[in-house]
């Protein structure tokens, strides 16, 4: 995939374009709880925490969380939100996590794995900071298990360009299991609708999805025009839902 520099443009609208509502957060937290150890509190790592979409909810549900984010601007947005006593945001990357060895019980990577350039280094670092038996919750798309959001078909090369961003599931699994990890769980999660079709169109216009970094300007323009015409027929109907994959891996 073409690298995306979140410090240039995307940070400005990311929180709005990728917002999750309270009901969606609840569904994801329930899914995370189902694959995490039962004990509380748990020390958590939100790796690639961005603008802090999930970090406070993780702290509320499970215990103190450190959000690690390489983008200065995205981190500034997160720090500008309401303070949370169980949350801190720090600079860092998957290949260089600024935490002590064996300091966290779990890590969440929510649609951030595909941005990691050196995946082998990231696996080593995750294995270092997680305690024995610690778990990685990897909400990633996979080329061979790729969701089909209703709006994607309106973009030229939409599905092809979006799926190409991600590795196949077996390749991701092999990256971890070849280094001593094991698969703990694989499931799909269907989050509730985020609003109307018209609201989804408005968020897509902000261009905060990785897809828009892979399309040409003309492809994005054509796709948005097609989508606008389709939405105009029924703008107030709920945005359709779709299943999203969640892979849980365990270290040691």
Where are these regions (language model features)?
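Conserved class I S-adenosyl-L-methionine
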Residues: 1-42, 53-57, 74-77, 81, 135-164
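Short catalytic micro-motifs in class I SAM-dependent methyltransferases
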Residues: 111-115
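Short alpha-helix
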Residues: 165-179
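Class I SAM-dependent methyltransferase SAM/SAH-binding core
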Residues: 45-47, 51-96
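A conserved beta-strand element that flanks and buttresses the S-adenosyl-L-methionine
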Residues: 108
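A short glycine-rich, Lys/Arg-flanked "PGG" loop and its adjoining helix->strand segment in the class I
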Residues: 120-132
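Conserved Class I S-adenosyl-L-methionine
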Residues: 21, 51, 182-252
């Amino acid at each position: 995939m073409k690298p995306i520099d979140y410090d240039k443009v995307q940070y400005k609208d990311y929180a709005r374009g990728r917002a999750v509502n309270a009901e969606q957060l609840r569904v994801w937290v329930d899914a995370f709880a189902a694959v995490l150890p039962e004990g509380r509190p748990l020390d958590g790592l939100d790796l690639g925490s961005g603008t802090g979409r999930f970090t406070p909810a993780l702290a509320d549900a499970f215990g103190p969380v450190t959000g690690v984010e390489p983008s200065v601007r995205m981190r500034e947005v997160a720090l500008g939100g309401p303070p949370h006593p169980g949350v801190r945001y720090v600079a860092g990357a998957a290949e260089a996590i600024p935490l002590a060895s064996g300091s966290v019980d779990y890590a969440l990577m929510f649609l951030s794995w595909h941005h990691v350039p050196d995946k082998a280094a990231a696996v080593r670092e995750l294995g270092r900071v997680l305690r024995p038996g610690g778990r990685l919750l990897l909400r990633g798309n996979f080329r061979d298990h790729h969701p089909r959001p209703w709006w994607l078909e309106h973009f030229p090369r939409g599905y092809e360009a979006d799926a190409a961003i991600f590795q196949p599931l077996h390749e991701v699994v092999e990256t971890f299991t070849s280094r001593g990890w094991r698969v703990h769980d694989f499931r799909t999660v269907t989050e509730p609708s985020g609003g109307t079709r018209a609201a989804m169109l408005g968020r897509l216009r902000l261009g905060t999805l990785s897809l828009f970094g892979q399309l040409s300007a003309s492809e994005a323009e054509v796709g948005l025009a097609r989508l606008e015409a389709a939405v105009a027929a029924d703008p107030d109907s709920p945005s359709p839902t779709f299943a999203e994959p969640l892979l849980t891996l365990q270290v040691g």
